[in-house]
């Protein structure tokens, strides 16, 4: 599984040739890429409708958008997507050679439009190369994109226990989401091997010293390694 961070919360994930673009927003200082530089993904996954998560979604309308039904409905009727997969909390869908499970995120959601529009709830995703199961002993690899969220008990009780991700991209910039301390606790609860900070140093309120996360994880009850990626850097999971 190839994980490429394009800054903020934008990730490109390749699972055995099936490709995903999560929360496309290339107007951030970490990336040198433009959305038009990105090869068409098979799927665009959207966690919620804030502008710093869907800002460049309109560039990828010739692919399949995935999200809560309210989100995918909006993307079809107002943005121009013609193919969509509407799913909801707890659901798993097969996408090419991968499986995508949706989980909730503890955040707000909304759109600035000329009229009221229900856009659904914020979410996160677990992408795996095998279907989640409790009965089969599968050698799976999985990646958790937490979306915008605060610390949630479900990270320990559901995601960590049942879905068992190997790696997690966690918002770390504080103010609007978790900060370094909560993100480090999340890493413990998730029991992941790899932690990737995201949603930090994009604009003033979320500028932090990212070394705080490294120190917090290092002093906690976890063997996870923090990987502070450069913009557009790829990690092989």
Swiss-Prot record:
The keyword Kinase does not apply. InterPro entries: Metallo-B-lactamas, RibonucZ/Hydroxyglut_hydro, UPF0173, UPF0173_UPF0282_UlaG_hydrolase. Keywords: Hydrolase. It holds the Pfam family Lactamase_B_2. GO terms for molecular function: hydrolase activity. Transmembrane segments: none annotated. Belongs to the UPF0173 family. This is UPF0173 metal-dependent hydrolase HQ_3368A. It comes from Haloquadratum walsbyi (strain DSM 16790 / HBSQ001).
């Amino acid at each position: 599984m190839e994980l490429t961070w394009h800054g903020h919360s934008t990730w490109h994930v390749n699972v055995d040739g099936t490709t995903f673009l999560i929360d496309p927003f290339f107007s951030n200082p970490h990336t040198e890429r433009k959305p038009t530089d990105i090869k068409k993904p098979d799927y665009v996954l959207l966690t919620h409708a804030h502008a710093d998560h869907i800002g460049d979604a309109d560039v990828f309308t010739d692919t399949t958008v995935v999200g809560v039904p309210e989100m995918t409905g909006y993307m079809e009727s107002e943005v121009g997507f013609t193919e969509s997969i509407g799913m909801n909390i707890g659901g798993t869908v097969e996408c090419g050679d991968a499986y995508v499970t949706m989980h909730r995120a503890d955040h707000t959601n909304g759109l600035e439009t000329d009229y009221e529009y229900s856009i659904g709830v914020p979410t996160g995703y677990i992408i795996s190369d095998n279907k989640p199961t409790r009965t089969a002993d599968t050698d799976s690899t999985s990646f958790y994109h937490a979306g915008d969220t605060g610390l949630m008990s479900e990270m320990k009780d559901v995601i960590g226990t049942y879905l068992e991700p190997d790696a997690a991209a966690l918002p770390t910039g504080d103010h609007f989401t978790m900060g370094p301390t909560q993100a480090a606790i999340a890493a413990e609860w998730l029991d992941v091997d790899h932690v990737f900070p995201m949603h930090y140093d994009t604009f003033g309120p979320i500028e932090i010293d990212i070394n705080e996360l490294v120190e917090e994880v290092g002093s906690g009850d976890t063997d996870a390694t923090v990987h502070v990626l450069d913009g557009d850097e790829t990690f092989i999971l």
